[in-house]
Amino acid sequence: MERRKVTIRYFLESKGKRRIAMITAYDYPTARLVDEAGVDGILVGDSLGMVVLGYESTIPVTLTDMLIHVAAVARAKPKALLVADMPFMTYETGPRDALKNASKLIRAGAEAVKPEGGLEIVRIVERLTKAGIPVMGHIGLNPQRVLTLGGFRMMGRTEEQRRKILEDAKALEEAGAFALVIEFVPAGLAREVTESVKIPTICIGAGPYCDGQILVLHDVIGLSEKPPSFAKRYADVASIIRNAVSNYVNEVKESKFPSPEYYKE
């Protein structure tokens, strides 16, 4: 039986009832495959800067980059909910710019957008949600702030950080966010956040107590050069690709390819 389209309502109704599984995808073929695998949500993440484009952080990723990849994923017509990251400096400059840029992502095929931050972006989230653009929040570690943080560090270890993250969660919920990604915080804190809000929480590197989980596809399938410590590798696709291409190269060098079944005289 063909599965139904996953909606914002599905996410909201999942709170405390069923686990939500999300993963990233950045192009048509992988979007099709992960959707066939049954994920509930696909995130076109600005992580594409690191795992696809070769940058050392997500900061160089532009809105143009995101629009190209969102459109590619949308062409797969996934049953999963399609969420798009808002890249660095496409929303921090104010609600007006955020609305303009978020609307471009929606027109490209996204069904929700995800800016990073808490209290400091509440006005932006309010503006987007009032305009009818669904927003998934992102608290804890904000990779777009790696320069300020001095690296990708676990957040929420100090009492001040803990209070801030709890306040961020409530503020984003009140601003209209339909879900929250909680990244790289202690599991106990993620549990506190999950129990303090009525919207679903999605953990990445934050333990088992959220309403769902998300990982970067390239980490899951073994394509990442330096996966984070919290990412589980479920396959070694890098070896499969390397071996396949090596076999192809060898057959070309040895004049074994193309063999008769692959051409006509």
Swiss-Prot record:
Details of cofactor binding: Binds 1 Mg(2+) ion per subunit.
GO CC terms, sorted: cytoplasm
Subcellular location: Cytoplasm
EC number from the UniProt entry: 2.1.2.11
CDD domains: KPHMT-like
InterPro entries (UniProt xref): Pantoate_hydroxy_MeTrfase, Pyrv/PenolPyrv_kinase-like_dom, Pyrv_kinase-like_dom_sf
Gene3D superfamilies in the record: Phosphoenolpyruvate-binding domains
The UniProt record lists the keyword Glycoprotein: no
GO biological process: coenzyme A biosynthetic process; pantothenate biosynthetic process
Residues involved in Mg(2+) binding: 46, 85, 116
Listed cofactors: Mg(2+)
Reaction(s) this enzyme catalyzes, per UniProt: 3-methyl-2-oxobutanoate + (6R)-5,10-methylene-5,6,7,8-tetrahydrofolate + H2O = 2-dehydropantoate + (6S)-5,6,7,8-tetrahydrofolate
Catalytic residues in the record: 183
GO molecular function, one term: magnesium ion binding
Residues binding 3-methyl-2-oxobutanoate: 46-47, 85, 114
Pathway(s) it belongs to: Cofactor biosynthesis; coenzyme A biosynthesis
Signal peptide: none
Enzyme type, top EC level: transferase
Keywords: Coenzyme A biosynthesis, Cytoplasm, Magnesium, Metal-binding, Transferase
PANTHER family named in the record: 3-METHYL-2-OXOBUTANOATE HYDROXYMETHYLTRANSFERASE (PTHR20881:SF0)
Free-text function comment from the UniProt entry: Catalyzes the reversible reaction in which hydroxymethyl group from 5,10-methylenetetrahydrofolate is transferred onto alpha-ketoisovalerate to form ketopantoate.
Complex formation: Homodecamer; pentamer of dimers.
Assigned protein family: Belongs to the PanB family.
Name of the molecule in the record: 3-methyl-2-oxobutanoate hydroxymethyltransferase
Biological classification of the source: Archaea, Thermoproteota, Thermoprotei, Thermoproteales, Thermoproteaceae
